[in-house]
């Protein structure tokens, strides 16, 4: 019976190893087929992805070449694989692009790179999830296997862990390559941005230089024109004074001629008519006085009308009239008044000659011999008083406008004031330009600081990602520890169940052969107890090693997290200092902007003074127009004279043309002043935009502060999570210690039982020796199986090398695993059933 039991045990052991061998062969074939299918699917998708990536790189190169030299529309159509049709239609690139278009395209490129970066990150996350799911499915399949596979589980896990480590390494390498590519693209974009800023600054400098040159040219032309205008005006004033002096001398000569005529007529009269002649002269002089008084009264009325008309019409009609209408209106009034005065003078002269005729009729004898002289003298007497009265009108009007001679001085003073105002305005503009340059430099510093902040934010995002990865690794380690605990508990349960079954079988055998082989039974039972003790000790050591490794890994992870936390603290302190510096700079900028606003107020005040001066100039121009009208009137009066009419007309026409040219030039200068005002308004708008940008920068800094506060809150939450993880690790260590205590207690009880049965199983020593020999044979077989497994491992390594060549394109493993997951799930279940 003992021999039959040994043979049965050997047969069972052989069938068990044959089962194991068959299952290993089947699993190897299945894994080979699955890996080949995965590799083929990955190769196809990798080829497609390589083609698409090559197309994208080619299009990106073409796009970068466009930024260097310009692209055509046909080359831009090849860029459609990266962007949608709407984006291509909106991006109508031209060879002559404006600065705003270039900045818009630069921003679109940055957004496009950010989108690609986010897509790559999402794809890497999906790939990591698929690999983790595959790893979990393999661990589950290994966990489902029977308890007899526990000894081979370590070897298979080592092989699988090596493959997964290689996969993780290749994934990290791919991620690093993609990150380096994106970093280089960011550097290229930053360089292009700096070049664009330099080009913009050069363009602005060119525009400023051109504007300065044009201003200098316009200023010189304006000054030359003003000097010429003043010279012409001075000449005109001198000529007018000379003409007035000539008119006054002419009047005196005419008066002398008239006196000579009257004296000659009186000489022809007889002595007894001397009294009548005296009477005539007295009457003539009285009439002349009355006529001059009437003329003066007429002039006074004219002056009153001239003074009254503007007062009456300034508020009603003159506001609604243009310059030409006003000139025609006043010319009509002046012509009417002149005609009225001429009619009055004509009446007086007629009365004079009627009286003289009556006198001559009374003295009838003296008229006959002098009829011819009388006719000539009558004609002269009619013309000479008219000319004298007109000359008196001209002199009276000259006396009415004594300020005409002093206008040169007033214009000179106004010119000096305008020069002073212009110099002050230029100084203020230079100060405004300097302040604008300072503001631009400060804005460039702010932009550099924002770029640095963005870089720090990217670094913070990377640190947060690393923290998330560490958290995932911690969770994976915890999951692996829990799975291992479950596996070992199952294994211990199987061991305890097998030991109980063996003990029961041994008890049955012992009862059967108790009477015959007491000594042999005690020896065999003792050997079995020793084997069980060895197995229990091995399991205890394995559990201790696993728990120690888990604790070491947890400690290492905690140390790394602590170091990363310290680095983040240092980075945040540096960012806080930079934020404080930026706030101080922004405060300084705000103060400078307040100063600029004050300077703008001063400029506005100076502009108001300039407008006042221009209004004064306008008034002087109105007076000059009045003078011009008076000159025209003088020309009309002097046109009746033959000698002075032609010269006066020519000179007045010349002066009139010069004044018209001066008016046109003044209008041109007004337009230039309006353009300068428009440029000042544009500069004020630019300053307002700069203020708006500064406010935007302040808002961004506030947002950064809120982000820092949120990061601090997240850091506190992470600390709490780490503390929870430490507590869980401590609890798991306590659970392991309790489990060890329980196992030791059970082992002690089992040892007591085995010692009790050891005294009854000495007779089974020989069979135990035979079993040892058979175990040696089976160990040799195991070594052969291990060599076979090593060969399989080498083949798997070769397959892993093949997979490493295609690891840059392992993004679609999840699909292949889903495709072949039924096969992987089918075989472990069949094995378990068998």
Curated annotation (Swiss-Prot):
The keyword Coiled coil applies. GO terms for cellular component: Golgi apparatus. It comes from the Eukaryota. It is found in: Golgi apparatus; Cytoplasm. InterPro entries: WAP (IPR037490). Expressed in seedlings, leaves and fruits. Keywords: Coiled coil, Cytoplasm, Golgi apparatus. Residues 410-456, 574-700, 792-812 form a coiled coil. The keyword Coiled coil applies. Interacts with MAF1. PANTHER family: WPP DOMAIN-ASSOCIATED PROTEIN (PTHR33883), WPP DOMAIN-ASSOCIATED PROTEIN-LIKE (PTHR33883:SF9). This is WPP domain-associated protein.
């Amino acid at each position: 019976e003992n021999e039959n039991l040994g043979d049965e045990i050997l047969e069972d052991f052989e069938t068990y190893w044959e089962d194991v061998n068959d299952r290993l062969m089947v699993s190897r074939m299945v894994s080979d087929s699955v890996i080949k299918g995965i590799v083929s699917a990955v190769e196809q998708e990798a080829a497609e992805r390589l083609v698409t990536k090559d197309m994208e790189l080619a299009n990106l190169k073409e796009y970068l070449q466009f930024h260097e030299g310009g692209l055509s529309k046909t080359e831009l159509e090849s860029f459609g694989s990266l962007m949608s049709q709407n984006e291509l239609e909106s991006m109508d690139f031209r060879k002559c692009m404006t600065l705003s278009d270039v900045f818009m395209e630069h921003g679109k490129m940055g957004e496009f790179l950010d989108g690609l970066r986010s897509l790559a990150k999402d794809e890497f996350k999906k790939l990591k999830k698929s690999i983790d799911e595959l790893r979990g499915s393999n661990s589950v399949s290994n966990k489902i296997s029977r308890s007899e596979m526990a000894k081979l589980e370590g070897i298979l896990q080592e092989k699988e862990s090596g493959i997964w480590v290689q996969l993780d390494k290749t994934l990290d390498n791919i991620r690093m390559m993609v990150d380096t590519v994106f970093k280089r693209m960011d550097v290229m974009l930053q360089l292009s941005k700096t070049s664009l800023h330099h080009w913009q600054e050069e363009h602005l400098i060119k525009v400023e230089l051109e504007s300065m040159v044009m201003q200098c040219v316009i200023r010189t032309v304006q000054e030359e024109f003003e000097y010429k205008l003043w010279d012409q005006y001075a000449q005109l004033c001198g000529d007018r004074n000379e003409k007035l002096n000539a008119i006054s001398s002419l009047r005196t000569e005419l008066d002398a001629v008239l006196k000579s005529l009257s004296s000659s007529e009186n000489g022809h009269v007889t002595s007894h008519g001397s009294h009548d002649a005296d009477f005539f002269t007295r009457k003539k002089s009285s009439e002349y006085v009355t006529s001059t008084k009437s003329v003066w009264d007429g002039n006074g009325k004219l002056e009153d009308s001239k003074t009254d008309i503007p007062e009456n019409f300034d508020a009603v009609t003159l506001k609604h009239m243009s310059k030409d209408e006003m000139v025609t209106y006043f010319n009509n009034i002046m012509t009417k008044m002149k005609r009225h005065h001429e009619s009055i003078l004509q009446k007086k002269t007629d009365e004079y000659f009627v009286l003289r005729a009556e006198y001559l009729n009374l003295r009838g004898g003296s008229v006959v011999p002098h009829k011819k002289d009388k006719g000539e003298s009558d004609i002269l007497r009619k013309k000479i008083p008219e000319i004298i009265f007109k000359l008196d009108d001209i002199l009276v009007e000259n006396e009415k406008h004594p300020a005409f001679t002093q206008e040169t001085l007033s214009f000179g003073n106004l010119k000096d004031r305008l020069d002073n105002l212009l110099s002050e305005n230029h100084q203020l503009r230079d100060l405004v330009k300097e302040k604008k340059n300072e503001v631009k430099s400060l804005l460039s510093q702010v932009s550099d600081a924002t770029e640095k902040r963005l870089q720090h934010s990217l670094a913070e995002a990377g640190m947060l990602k690393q923290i998330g990865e560490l958290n995932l690794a911690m969770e994976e380690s915890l999951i692996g520890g829990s799975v291992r605990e479950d596996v070992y508990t199952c294994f211990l349960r199987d061991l305890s169940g097998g030991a109980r079954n063996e003990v029961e079988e041994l008890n049955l055998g012992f009862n059967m052969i108790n009477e015959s082989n007491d000594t042999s039974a005690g020896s065999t039972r003792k050997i079995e107890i020793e084997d069980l003790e060895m197995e229990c000790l091995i399991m205890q050591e394995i559990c201790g090693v696993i728990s120690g490794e888990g604790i070491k890994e947890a400690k290492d992870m905690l140390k790394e997290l602590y170091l990363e936390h310290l680095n983040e603290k240092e980075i945040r302190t540096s960012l806080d200092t930079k934020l404080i510096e930026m706030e101080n700079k922004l405060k300084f900028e705000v103060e400078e902007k307040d100063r600029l606003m004050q300077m703008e107020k001063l400029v506005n005040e100076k502009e108001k003074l300039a407008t006042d001066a221009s209004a004064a100039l306008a008034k002087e121009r109105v007076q000059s127009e009045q003078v011009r009208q008076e000159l025209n009137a003088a020309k009309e009066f002097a046109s009746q004279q033959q000698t002075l009419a032609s010269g006066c007309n020519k000179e007045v026409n010349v002066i009139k043309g010069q004044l018209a040219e001066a008016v046109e030039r003044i209008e041109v200068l007004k337009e230039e002043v309006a353009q300068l005002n428009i440029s000042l308004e544009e500069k004020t708008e630019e300053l307002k935009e700069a203020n708006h940008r500064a406010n935007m920068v302040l808002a961004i800094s506030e947002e950064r502060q809120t982000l820092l506060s949120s990061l601090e809150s997240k850091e506190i939450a992470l600390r709490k999570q780490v503390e929870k993880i430490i507590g869980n690790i401590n609890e798991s260590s306590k659970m392991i210690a309790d489990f060890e205590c329980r196992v030791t207690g059970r082992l002690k009880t089992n040892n007591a039982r085995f010692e009790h049965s050891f005294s009854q199983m000495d007779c089974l020593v020989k069979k135990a020796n035979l079993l040892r020999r058979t175990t040696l044979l089976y160990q040799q077989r195991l070594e052969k199986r291990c060599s076979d497994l090593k060969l399989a491992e080498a083949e798997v390594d070769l397959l892993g090398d093949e997979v490493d060549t295609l690891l840059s394109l392992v993004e679609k493993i999840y699909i292949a695993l889903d495709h072949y997951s039924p096969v992987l799930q089918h075989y472990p279940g069949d094995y378990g059933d068998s």
